[in-house]
């Protein structure tokens, strides 16, 4: 779009031999009544409209910043009509919810502290190229629209996806290019002086990583390689931030004055500190969470009660001041004494326990505990037709591994709403899913849909990484042949000025309190050989990449220790549970698919009815057969092979066949699907000791089993049968050849 009222700026992402990508930020044409509106375009094909608006009046009753990020996926962006009953977009997809979290996390820390006006950022996907994703473009669009909105925002922030493709970190990779990638990483950051400080990371090894690493010799995404990726993202982030800043210099509104509500005034802090300092310091050395929190609540209640008279109507300030003092003490102990509230050193891990097969009947189960964090993992297997069907803007249309995470309120000893998952639960489930996807067996190697559920039964730090560990154990217990076990650990960071210099302390296996009062939540999952998933959230304006590289190395030590503990519980896949379905495959020629299905599905339905198996056929001729037991699945496979991979019957072969039709001169007997023969009335007499048979129906009825032998095959391939009288027909046996040559 061009016009006198339109301002724009562009950023060029130079990927060398992989070409360039152009990101354009434009404002002045659309959504003019929003406080800030930016149209972001990637290579003129993918278009996202970002708007930022602020409420006119502050929400004084809130003790948090009410920022909301919404992503509106429009199916017309991809030339689609929604598949819902009303043919209209409804509730946001999982991908949209994850994109909301991806945008919220780097933006939230950059607003002025104490802001209580509602701020809403809405991302509308207007057009999308089928080979591109919109989420990273939306991060930049959200930053740009907020930067020009007149809100107190210390941006801009730039976001880029980099993928490690054939040894090169490529910015804004296409889906087709990522098929050759071993690692995919979204990095957000802001320019600080001559450097770029990292504010958010979301990364994972790709679905194809294992094949590329083990089969084609691609480099594994080790901690050192991932650290290189963070550095590789910096020039791209700088270019995006500079383009946003250039747009803001020409189009930004003047920053408005918004009321800021500090959590407490200095006099409240001083009074609380004088009242509780000694008691608080002692309470923070109690290792047990419940006991410690009970004692902290007692101290707070006593302090508020004692000071209430002098701070009438300011009780919230006293509580906030007490929380700030608690934070100060915890951080001071860590930075100066290397002491943590539960008595551990900075690199120590809480006690670990791992157990499998903890539930009856289910296909796989495990219980993983790390300190007071307890996760129950449960695995369910089924046929591939039960995999999740996706109706999204991405080219991915199905998902066979589904990871659901539940965080009930009782896990923290509280009450609350239960039911449909919240955004946090969806995000945690997606993180655990990404950590495990790279080690799943291939579809043809393990043709099952897998649903993994993580139940957070008790929480005191990093239930998402506990879910990764419990899921690995549970899937091995279910018989899933994982390529390697995966474990996860949450790292924390505390930073402050000590003796005139900024000091950083990295914590291994953080508690809930260390997450709340620290500066970073850095989750790392992986195998013994490489990293499979990363998630970084920070409350700072940014963290030096060198600090993150050190945290990655420290996380690896912890991960290896956890994997050792898990291996003591289970280190190889168990036998599949008796309650799990059995799925086998058979390959049929593509031109035989129609014969297997039959007219109007008659043949495949007959096989399913006869054997009790479920059958699904892929376009390439792969047939998946699922049944509650092995014999049923094998019977279905034999029936399919008899149609699609037949052999010519031979004289002398014996079968237990099924009568499918009777006539005045005999009975037609089905030997295998599609292969019938005539048992003449003269042969039927042998079944009754040679007595005369007036009506065939008096001896044989449709559906009855009878053992026969092929007596003759005429030139047209028609079969004449003889009755076998020396053996009793097996009424409940499936139609199958009684000699080895009759097996199909």
Swiss-Prot record:
List of residues binding Mg(2+): 515, 521
Q: Which SUPFAM superfamilies did the record assign?
A: Eukaryotic type KH-domain (KH-domain type I), Nucleic acid-binding proteins, Polynucleotide phosphorylase/guanosine pentaphosphate synthase (PNPase/GPSI), domain 3, Ribonuclease PH domain 2-like, Ribosomal protein S5 domain 2-like
User: Which biological process terms from the Gene Ontology are attached to this UniProt entry?
Assistant: mRNA catabolic process; RNA processing
Question: What's a single GO CC term here?
Answer: cytosol
Q: Which residues form the KH domain?
A: 581-640
InterPro entries for the chain: ExoRNase_PH_dom1 (IPR001247), ExoRNase_PH_dom2_sf (IPR036345), GPSI/PNP (IPR014069), KH_dom (IPR004087), KH_dom_type_1 (IPR004088), KH_dom_type_1_sf (IPR036612), NA-bd_OB-fold (IPR012340), PNPase (IPR012162)
| EC nos | 2.7.7.8
Q: Which part of the chain is the S1 motif domain?
A: 652-724
Could you identify this protein by its name?
Polyribonucleotide nucleotidyltransferase
Name the gene behind this protein.
Answer: pnp
